[in-house]
Swiss-Prot record:
Acts as a component of the Mcm2-7 complex (Mcm complex) (Mcm complex) which is the putative replicative helicase essential for 'once per cell cycle' DNA replication initiation and elongation in eukaryotic cells. Core component of CDC45-MCM-GINS (CMG) helicase, the molecular machine that unwinds template DNA during replication, and around which the replisome is built. It comes from Drosophila melanogaster (Fruit fly). PROSITE patterns: MCM_1, MCM_2. ADP binds at residues 348, 388-390, 392. The modification Phosphothreonine is found at residues 690, 692. Its EC number is 3.6.4.12. SMART domains: AAA, MCM. Component of the Mcm2-7 complex. The complex forms a toroidal hexameric ring with the proposed subunit order Mcm2-Mcm6-Mcm4-Mcm7-Mcm3-Mcm5. Gene3D superfamilies: 2.20.28.10, mini-chromosome maintenance (MCM) complex, chain A, domain 1, Nucleic acid-binding proteins, P-loop containing nucleotide triphosphate hydrolases. This is DNA replication licensing factor Mcm3.
Length: 819
């Protein structure tokens, strides 16, 4: 029987040699073998579809009797390789064959992998949950006997080998005569061995049931081909191993999959960039509005949030990481926090980043612990040793971590990511393990305010409720509000309804939709000829899907092209220009020195030295979007605009009850007067006190303005509004207030050149007077002495206002103090 089995293997080996030697036909696999030899690889990937066309009987036998067929195919490959390159065949003891293509009903999931597939070749898809350490497995040991001076060798096989009879695993220590043997480790042959565990994809698991898993055995060149969290497609032979309990073999068996090919289904592995793609990206980068086009193409199904999309684009592009000669690391990763009301598409923006970024790890605040985000110390089941398991942020090294429900995390777990967000590494010192792991990732987090919804009558710090040490590590913090506006609501509702009405053009009438469609399904049966098709640059316009939110001439980049553009743009390393450096330094010093001069504006996060690095990173990301080698002043201004939008938030005052009309009776006036006198002065608006002339009780008549529907709750300009013009903003002013409002107008704008001349003349007046303070009237008359172009009253008022804002002078009771 053994002779017949060996003869059968030799017969089918000749058929496989004929399949590989196809130079007279198309020469596909003859060329693949030559490429394998040139790359010094040990594994040839064969498409099952090609084998079905040329030799259907062997293809059927390969799927049903995997062990013998793979053994014969491997020998045939070595035989054919020895004819092409004899030296290469002698160098490698074994050559391996991997398979891909369509496996029909043998394309299964871990749940459907039952005993009927034992001995068959199957294709399994799943998510890698656990990866063991790589350990050497002995293939052939060489032993030397000092007494007889003879050398003997022994081969080892186990149940994971394709040989029929497994050998013992013990090393020989004595020969037949009882002489001691010495193992020659340098002459012995070992192979790498690793085990994986893949779990059923959650979208393919039946409703209400937990996903199942299967163990995978990888040898030689298949080790370290994937990491935990990867979606993989593994082809291999399904085999059972006997289970032992107490030294006896039980009736139940343990099943494993002996892998021969591992394909990654993640976005990063399938990113094939050609020379044409690079030229197309460079051509597109020459457009003046490339940054707006890229940001508009981010999550086009979400209406609005233009600044948030620009920030997410900067996060995907990133800054330039610097390692100084003394070892100091300046991070280039950009961190963004989205906080705001429910139903403003925060989680949907995170979901889009997961589909766009080359490497992105999703997690939630409540479902993640501190060690789950960084690293955990576990016990190896095989050896019992303590080992490290990487967390989400370590797995997302050089990628993005998306944390939803960030406010639901406990303070202890939230503190664990402080080191990662700034230093880009995780330091572990526990259970006798001292290690430092790289976690150079960007963090995109979404959270709800402390009160569930954003309270506009409280400061941003009170609404956010996070520590300053954590907030300063976020480069940008956006407050996203659900503002009631009939026009905007109408546009959003029209946009959402059109998306729900949309149907795929390829969908037939009455065709049932698949329940478990996923990104991996679309790649399961893709042939190699279809993978290299050109990527569409723009999305096709659909009147039903896009509707009023997008005109026909407006263009949106496709998701596939966005991935390629971001990947190419991240290779650029722009350098800061002198003008950009000066603009960034001036803006940072202004942010540090400026207090909240407006009574209704507060900062969303503290201004620290990290803010300066934020401006640099955002400027660099904007330059990368243009694929520029240098950071210009336009890039710096774009970064400043983003920071201005994200750092300041308007705070509204509580509505005060207005006084009743005077003809309603004196009793009502007295009651109102008592109520106003009992009100704390701290609750009184500064704007109200400034707008009133005297200390008359009519100051209570003035109500703060209601929030405008079109107001984006952001400070639109860098210069704050002067206190004198506040009365113009009051709603429904009385006749007395109208007189105040008409008499006080906004100061005239003064140019920078005239402002510098005014500063020089003012310094001269203070030097001549040898005083630290001068009356404003004296300055007004003396400032124009000897001047060829006298300053107007409006220019003087504007200059004093500008210098007061810059903390250069202080005005009190019409006296100017020099700071």
């Amino acid at each position: 029987m053994a002779h017949e089995g060996e003869q059968f293997i030799k017969d089918i080996q000749r058929e496989y040699v004929d399949f590989l030697d196809d130079e007279e036909d198309q020469g596909i696999y003859a060329g693949h073998v030559k490429d394998m030899i040139a790359e010094k690889s040990k594994r040839l990937i064969v498409n099952v579809n090609d084998l079905k066309r040329k030799n259907p009987q062997r293809a059927l036998g390969l799927l049903s009797n995997a062990a013998d067929e793979q053994l014969a195919f491997g020998r045939a490959l070595k035989e054919y390789a020895s004819t092409v390159d004899p030296g290469y065949a002698k160098m490698h003891e074994d050559l391996f064959v991997g398979f891909e293509g369509c496996f029909g009903n043998r394309h299964v999931t871990p749940r459907s992998l039952t005993s009927i597939y034992l001995g068959n070749m199957v294709c399994v898809e799943g998510i890698v949950t656990k990866v063991s350490l790589i350990r050497p497995k002995v293939v052939r040991s060489v032993h030397y006997c000092p007494n007889t001076r003879k050398v003997m060798e022994r081969k080892y096989t186990d149940l994971t080998s394709f040989e029929a009879v497994p050998s013992g695993a013990a090393y020989p220590t004595k020969d037949e005569d009882g002489n001691l043997l010495e193992t020659e480790y340098g002459l012995s042959v070992y192979k790498d061995h690793q085990t994986l565990t893949i779990q059923e994809m959650p979208e393919k698991a039946p409703a209400g049931q937990l996903p199942r898993s299967v163990d995978i055995v990888c040898d030689d060149d298949l080790v370290d081909r994937c990491k935990p969290g990867d979606r993989v497609q593994i082809v291999g032979s399904y085999r059972c191993l006997p289970g032992k309990r107490g030294g006896y073999t039980s009736g139940t068996f343990r099943t494993v999959l002996l892998a021969n090919n591992i394909s990654l289904l993640s976005k990063e592995s399938n990113l094939d960039i050609s020379r044409e793609d690079i030229m197309l990206c460079k051509k597109l980068a020459k457009n003046n509005d490339i940054f707006e086009l890229l940001s508009k193409s981010l999550a086009p199904s979400i209406h609005g949030h233009a600044y948030v999309k620009q920030a997410i684009l900067c996060l995907l592009l990133g800054g330039v990481e610097k390692i100084l000669p003394n070892g100091t690391r300046l991070r280039g990763d950009i961190n963004v926090l989205l906080i705001g009301d429910p139903s403003v598409a925060k989680s949907q923006l995170l979901r889009y980043v997961l589909n766009t970024a080359p490497r992105a790890i999703p997690t939630t605040g409540r479902g993640s612990s501190g060690v789950g985000l960084t690293a955990a110390v576990t016990t190896d089941q095989e050896t019992g040793e303590r080992r490290l398991e990487a967390g989400a942020m370590v797995l997302a090294d050089r990628g993005v971590v998306c944390i939803d429900e960030f406010d639901k995390m406990s303070d202890i777990d939230r503190t664990a990511i402080h080191e990662v967000m700034e230093q880009g590494r995780v330091t572990i010192s526990k259970a006798g393990i001292h290690a430092s792991l790289n976690a150079r990732c960007s963090v995109l987090a979404a959270a709800n305010p402390v009160y569930g919804r954003y309270d506009q009558y409280k400061t941003p710090m009170e609404n956010i409720g996070l520590q300053d040490s954590l907030l300063s590590r976020f480069d940008l913090l956006f407050v996203m509000l659900d503002v009631i506006d009939s026009d905007v609501d109408q546009m959003i509702s029209d946009h959402v309804v059109r998306m729900h009405r949309y149907r795929n053009p390829k969908e037939a009438d009455g065709e049932p939709l698949s329940m478990g469609s996923s990104y991996a399904d679309s790649l399961s049966f893709v042939s190699s000829s279809e993978e290299k098709k050109d990527t569409e640059v723009y999305e096709k316009y659909d009147a039903l899907l896009h509707g009023k939110s997008r005109q026909r001439h407006e263009k949106i980049l496709s998701v596939e092209f966005m991935r390629k553009y971001i990947h190419i743009a991240k290779c650029m390393k722009p350098k800061l220009g002198e003008q950009a450096c000066e603009a960034i330094a001036n803006e940072y010093s202004r942010l540090r020195s400026q207090e909240a001069v407006e009574t209704d504006v507060a900062r969303t996060q503290p201004i620290t030295a990290r803010t300066l690095e934020t401006l640099i990173r955002l400027s660099t990301a904007h330059a990368r979007a243009r694929m520029s080698k240098s950071v210009t002043i336009d890039d710096a201004h774009a970064a400043i605009e983003l920071v201005q939008f994200a750092y300041f938030k308007k705070v509204l005052d509580k509505d005060r009850p207005s006084k009743r009309r005077r003809n309603s009776g004196s009793d009502a006036e007295d009651d109102n007067g008592e109520a106003s006198s009992q009100r704390s002065p701290s609750r009184r608006s500064k704007r109200t006190r400034t707008a009133t002339v005297g200390a008359d009780s009519d100051e209570e008549d003035i109500e703060p303005p209601q929030p405008d529907a079109g107001d984006l709750t952001r400070r639109e300009t860098r210069r704050s509004l002067p206190a004198r013009s506040v009365a113009m903003l009051m709603a429904s002013p009385s006749s007395e207030e109208q007189s105040v409002a008409t008499s006080t107008t906004e100061p005239a704008i003064i140019s920078d050149a005239r402002l510098g001349e005014f500063k020089n003349n003012l310094q001269r007046l203070f030097r001549e007077a040898r005083e630290q303070s001068l009356a404003l009237a004296r300055i007004t008359t003396a400032i124009n002495v000897g001047s060829q172009e006298p300053f107007t009253a409006g220019e003087i008022e504007a200059a004093v206002h500008r210098m007061t804002e810059d903390n250069q002078i202080m005005v009190a009771d019409d006296i100017v103090f020099l700071i």
